């Protein structure tokens, strides 16, 4: 007696069972849309951060001026691709006019894909120049097998790029070194060179004829890795020359990554220290006249004290992790 009623109840509920997959599919679509929206939001945030940091560096150090012709050195790696990409997009909103010319030095390394950069740059519709110079053969002839060739290769490359800049009429040479490169160089000089010396954001070249700028000076390498993946740059491997890796620099890179992971704020403080130097509390008499220092008998509220407050408390560290806010005159970012 109850069986038909039970059957009828199941039949009545059957349409609901058939609609369940449709409801589930709709939910999956909504979840997919939410993921896409979140991903798009994060991507936009990443670009805005890169644009803000590059614009800040340009403004802080007056890297690019009205009428400049900026020679962007493009190696085919993630850093130089990102530098070119961000500079091109900033130029659209910059309050000044400047030109960009992309330059690649083809050093005739075995396996170098010569077609990649010309094809990529042609699509961007910007002026570019490929300089063909067989420095690879020179380096292989002069450096013993198994030794790193980076130092000699870098010197040869630098001289060629300086010459090309003059031939193209470039007023600035832009290199793709980022914040991590600067910190690695600082530690290398400190640990192995006995010098407090980093990598300047702007410098006059040793030939006195060129100004070199590093627009990525404030940018973290991890952000450049994410941006390169997002933009799907056609990356060219950097180990085609077969040189032994620079093990000391790799060691510094690993050290910085480990500190950043284990001790939040430490790497930020290290970087901030590069722009907060107190020569009177170091020991370089070329920077501060220790020999002629005398007591004046007058108090100076801004003068030195014999014993500084310990800078390693939690409050002190947290207060130093962020750079002070500064006005960026180079470009407005609100509409990016």
Swiss-Prot record:
<protein>
    <recommendedName>
        <fullName>tRNA-cytidine(32) 2-sulfurtransferase</fullName>
        <ecNumber>2.8.1.-</ecNumber>
    </recommendedName>
</protein>
<comment type="similarity">
    <text>Belongs to the TtcA family.</text>
</comment>
<keyword id="KW-0067">ATP-binding</keyword>
<dbReference type="GO" id="GO:0034227">
    <property type="term" value="P:tRNA thio-modification"/>
</dbReference>
<keyword id="KW-0479">Metal-binding</keyword>
<comment type="function">
    <text>Catalyzes the ATP-dependent 2-thiolation of cytidine in position 32 of tRNA, to form 2-thiocytidine (s(2)C32). The sulfur atoms are provided by the cysteine/cysteine desulfurase (IscS) system.</text>
</comment>
<dbReference type="GO" id="GO:0000287">
    <property type="term" value="F:magnesium ion binding"/>
</dbReference>
<keyword id="KW-0963">Cytoplasm</keyword>
<dbReference type="GO" id="GO:0005737">
    <property type="term" value="C:cytoplasm"/>
</dbReference>
<dbReference type="InterPro" id="IPR012089">
    <property type="entry name" value="tRNA_Cyd_32_2_STrfase"/>
</dbReference>
<keyword id="KW-0547">Nucleotide-binding</keyword>
<dbReference type="GO" id="GO:0000049">
    <property type="term" value="F:tRNA binding"/>
</dbReference>
<keyword id="KW-0411">Iron-sulfur</keyword>
<feature type="region of interest" description="Disordered">
    <location>
        <begin position="301"/>
        <end position="328"/>
    </location>
</feature>
<dbReference type="InterPro" id="IPR014729">
    <property type="entry name" value="Rossmann-like_a/b/a_fold"/>
</dbReference>
<dbReference type="GO" id="GO:0051539">
    <property type="term" value="F:4 iron, 4 sulfur cluster binding"/>
</dbReference>
<keyword id="KW-0004">4Fe-4S</keyword>
<comment type="subunit">
    <text>Homodimer.</text>
</comment>
<comment type="pathway">
    <text>tRNA modification.</text>
</comment>
<dbReference type="GO" id="GO:0005524">
    <property type="term" value="F:ATP binding"/>
</dbReference>
<keyword id="KW-0819">tRNA processing</keyword>
<dbReference type="InterPro" id="IPR011063">
    <property type="entry name" value="TilS/TtcA_N"/>
</dbReference>
<keyword id="KW-0808">Transferase</keyword>
<keyword id="KW-0694">RNA-binding</keyword>
<feature type="binding site">
    <location>
        <position position="150"/>
    </location>
    <ligand>
        <name>[4Fe-4S] cluster</name>
    </ligand>
</feature>
<feature type="short sequence motif" description="PP-loop motif">
    <location>
        <begin position="75"/>
        <end position="80"/>
    </location>
</feature>
<feature type="compositionally biased region" description="Polar residues">
    <location>
        <begin position="315"/>
        <end position="328"/>
    </location>
</feature>
<dbReference type="GO" id="GO:0016783">
    <property type="term" value="F:sulfurtransferase activity"/>
</dbReference>
<dbReference type="Pfam" id="PF01171">
    <property type="entry name" value="ATP_bind_3"/>
</dbReference>
<feature type="binding site">
    <location>
        <position position="153"/>
    </location>
    <ligand>
        <name>[4Fe-4S] cluster</name>
    </ligand>
</feature>
<keyword id="KW-0460">Magnesium</keyword>
<keyword id="KW-0408">Iron</keyword>
<feature type="binding site">
    <location>
        <position position="241"/>
    </location>
    <ligand>
        <name>[4Fe-4S] cluster</name>
    </ligand>
</feature>
<feature type="region of interest" description="Disordered">
    <location>
        <begin position="1"/>
        <end position="42"/>
    </location>
</feature>
<keyword id="KW-0820">tRNA-binding</keyword>
